[in-house]
Amino acid sequence: MAQSTREIKRRISSVNSTKQITRAMEMVAAAKLRRAQQRVEDNRPYEEKMRQAIFRILNQAKTISHPLMESKGQDLPAGHIIMAADRGLCGGYNVNVAKAAAEHIGENKESTKIIAVGKYVRDYFKKRDYNVISEYLDIEDYPSFDRPQMIAEAVEQMFSDGVIGEVYLTFAEFQNAMIQRPVTRKILPMSKEAFLPPEEESENADDTEQNNQDPAETAGLEDQIYKFEPSAGAVLGGLLSSYMKSTLFRALLESKASEQGARMTAMKNATDNAEDMIEELTLSYNKARQGAITQEILEVVSGAEAAK
């Protein structure tokens, strides 16, 4: 029985050490999450203003086009950018993103070129014999604009050269610390629909229409105050390229926020489980100790009875 109590005490000590580690990791992830979440919020106005500028150009110059908006045909392979973490200990975050991308690719495995962002994505798809053509690893917790710019320039070049005919992006859209939703979006070729105003603006347009005002005419009057130098096409080209980089930057920021949220949640669950285990082990220890004491008392009483 004494051996049993020693073993239980050893297990309690081991679990308690693990709990201290998971608690520390939870606190670190929470601190990183707050900063990552703030960066996501700070980036949204910039991307929204750029989207509005592109929409104004496309709405004003009805016939304008750009190579990034032109289809390359159905026979070319597709490019697929997949973003996840370099490290684990973040619950199901990595595997959920990878499975979402694999599900989207489906039976087009042979005709899909994968751009892996993060070690988990690279390893996951290489082990399954997917065509991983490039990889971007060791992404910082607070990414700079350099990585998305490198990825965007490489992808745009492949698209322009006809190496790939379309490009998809899979990443975990950050909603809150508990929820990270894997999404897949087509980012090349771009379409005018991608730059339409969000639902809030559409609802406002509906209200305007109910007031007997034509939103199309209103938008047209608003667009007339804009003049583009040297031309609308040149401005559009620069904006589309910048928007591509901004899209990847936002996706990377959301991926990092999702990673930290998932890690914080996973470490909190691990800490809670450790506390539950310590309670159970402590109860077992007390029962074992009580049993040992009872046994000793019985032995003393038996010895006293035998001595009479």
Curated annotation (Swiss-Prot):
Key words of the record: ATP synthesis, Cell membrane, CF(1), Hydrogen ion transport, Ion transport, Membrane, Transport
Main location: membrane
Keyword field contains Nucleotidyltransferase: no
GO biological process entries: proton motive force-driven plasma membrane ATP synthesis
Gene Ontology CC annotation, any one: plasma membrane
Any matching Pfam family: ATP-synt
Molecular-function GO terms, alphabetical: ATP binding; proton-transporting ATP synthase activity, rotational mechanism
Membrane topology annotation: Peripheral membrane protein
Localization, UniProt: Cell membrane
Entry annotated with the keyword Membrane: yes
Function as written in the Swiss-Prot or TrEMBL entry: Produces ATP from ADP in the presence of a proton gradient across the membrane. The gamma chain is believed to be important in regulating ATPase activity and the flow of protons through the CF(0) complex.
Family, similarity comment: Belongs to the ATPase gamma chain family.
Oligomer and partners: F-type ATPases have 2 components, CF(1) - the catalytic core - and CF(0) - the membrane proton channel. CF(1) has five subunits: alpha(3), beta(3), gamma(1), delta(1), epsilon(1). CF(0) has three main subunits: a, b and c.
HAMAP family according to UniProt: ATP_synth_gamma_bact
Protein name listed in UniProt: ATP synthase gamma chain
